[in-house]
Amino acid sequence: MYKYVVEREIKRYRSHCSNIMEQLRDMLNEKYDINTQFSLVGSGGDSRNMVTRNGDGSFDLDYNLVIISMPNAFWDNLKRLKDTVRDSLNRIVGNTWFSDGKDSRSVITSILHFKDSPKVEFSFDIAILARNSNGNLCRLIHNNKGCWNESFAWNEVPSSHNVKDKADALKANGLWNELRAVYLDKKNMYLSRRDDNHPSFIIYIESVNELYNRHF
């Protein structure tokens, strides 16, 4: 079952990852004219610790890299966009203990390796997002069915356009611990169902919307 990770265990990893993300943001802007903003998903934000681990397993931090603007060449070729982000990340982590970014369906994952242990203890995931005309966030999804049959598309995240405002309202009204409980229950519910289609970011949005609608 999922449980929360204590803040003191998260702090140093968050500092390292934020530094890498700052370098990534700057490199994308300077080399490719890709203007982005990055943020920790609500499950990892400062003073909002909702980072979880399954049992005694490893944990990760989830980052959103939101596209603000970029040349049409990238809008028209989403594979090129994801490859550019991953290649840029690899240049940055090349001199660290983090591995090159591994591509998956919805994120790029970098793993921290320890010299004294081959066991993976920490990783961080980067999801690439952009907003559609409705203001909702859309995640870049890589549907890989083999080298000759793959596609890239934006997948809308429902009810995500004002989730930050709702989360701020919950926190301001002393409801953050209740949100933590809802979020953890949902994480364990999807775990019991063996549902891999609800990453932390989606569960966080579901939890915020559910609790906000309950109280406001």
What positions do the PLM features span?
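Conserved catalytic core of two-metal-ion nucleotidyltransferases
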Residues: 28-32, 79-134
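Short glycine-rich, low-complexity/disordered patches
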Residues: 24-41, 94-109, 191-206, 214-216
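Helical scaffold of the NTase/Pol beta-like nucleotidyltransferase catalytic core
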Residues: 1-42
